[in-house]
Amino acid sequence: MDKKGWSLKGSLLPLLLLVSDLLLCQSVASLPICPTGAVNCQVSLRDLFDRAVILSHYIHNLSSEMFNEFDKRYAQGRGFITKAINSCHTSSLSTPEDKEQAQQIHHEDLLNLILRVLRSWNDPLYHLVTEVRGMQEAPDSILSRAIEIEEQNRRLLEGMEKIVGQVHPGVRENEVYSVWSGLPSLQMADEDTRLFAFYNLLHCLRRDSHKIDNYLKLLKCRIVYDSNC
């Protein structure tokens, strides 16, 4: 391909990625939700899984974009990645690392594990939004993504609770989750310590959102399509 062709391709790629993100965002915005307090609102298990998979994929995309932007703006040359390995607050939850491991887990246990991970992010996502608002010169794109992820995480958690209610009606799962204690680090006066705390939190969010996305796709195949997919 000539140089002109490569130039055209390079100029089109960001536009295609933007269109893809906009379409995914529109898909999330148009997902059917039962009105709060609705008594007779029934959504099929298949529709619930469809919605959950779209939401989880959307959250993972936003998490990856937010982490990548933060990394470029604040973490270059600081060696944060070597310190971030195995330092997530959700590491206390035993989560399968790949598809093969996840396939060995009973679907009931995997559903409950997703609930625990999602609940473990309620508090840190709330404080992430609050602290990013207070960051000097923090770009609006990072703040807007943090706000969107917090909202969609709540929606996904509500959807997962409905899924568990249909798969195992009458069974109430204990609200077990991993406690996050990283707020003081996000508020440290030392810039390097504070920036690493943000970096680590976003790194863990990207990791966990990717796991949830994969687990949900596996569960949808197993439960909705009886593993015929």
UniProtKB/Swiss-Prot annotation:
Cell location: Secreted
GO BP annotations listed: female pregnancy; lactation; negative regulation of endothelial cell proliferation; positive regulation of canonical NF-kappaB signal transduction; positive regulation of cell population proliferation; positive regulation of lactation; positive regulation of miRNA transcription; positive regulation of receptor signaling pathway via JAK-STAT
Entries under Pfam families matching the protein: Hormone_1
Disulfide linkage: C34-C41, C88-C204, C221-C229
The organism's place on the tree of life at top rank: Eukaryota
Keyword terms of this UniProt record: Disulfide bond, Hormone, Lactation, Phosphoprotein, Secreted, Signal
GO cellular component: extracellular space
Stated role: Prolactin acts primarily on the mammary gland by promoting lactation.
Database matches in PANTHER family: PROLACTIN (PTHR11417:SF5), SOMATOTROPIN,PROLACTIN (PTHR11417)
Family: Belongs to the somatotropin/prolactin family.
Name of the protein in its database record: Prolactin
Organism of origin: Ailuropoda melanoleuca
Lineage, top ranks: Eukaryota, Metazoa, Chordata, Craniata, Vertebrata
